[in-house]
């Protein structure tokens, strides 16, 4: 697949109008609500982590048919995650971050928006390609790894500043998403089509509400955030997620000898902005909330430019 200059411009405009604009509209609504009313951000956080996140994880896992050809993409997502964990840990130590900031900094790099940003983006980029369905299925593999890492590594990073290892593990085990992931995997082996039962529509309704609820909650959090435009760590985290992240992805893809459409999908997928969940986790565990919220906003805004470049480069670096 090759992308012309006109197509690149169209992709840029699409990202701006269909990904960036809707995201910021919902964030802005939450911001206005947070300024106008006295809202408890922790109540919203509890609703998201105990209802919406488990529903999203369950539906995505249950609906995804994992076949042999997807295992390489799954393996890539795990290896790339390990690379990001290693890089972000070393970078954080180099900057001599506190435990709290170090955890938030690491989450801002290794937790990326593979769901409500990455999935529609991959759908758009490959929609006119004969590999469209394959591309989306690969993205779902990445999404599964990110879902699991968010509810394990992400929670651990955010909680370790004020909790010991045992307490951090207890916090992780209290999150229902861990159990819904296990339940989804087990139910896939049972000769019962859950999508035909009366329970399924309710779960889907919750899954569909996850994105809007998360973004409005982020807006409420931002309304209570003191912005520090001189916060160097925000810009370093943004640089790491949007520029170093794709570079590390390219090296990983090259070393794993991945080519063609799969290489294009994985490079683009690994270049998306910091996940909203990074900010929500920070709110839930009261860990560097302002920093995390600012990184989500900054990376989301600037990704309209960086992603356009990555998409174009992917067609040059990995021919089909």
Regions found by a protein language model. Give the residues of each.
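Alpha-helical transmembrane segments of multi-pass small-molecule/ion transporters
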Residues: 1-320
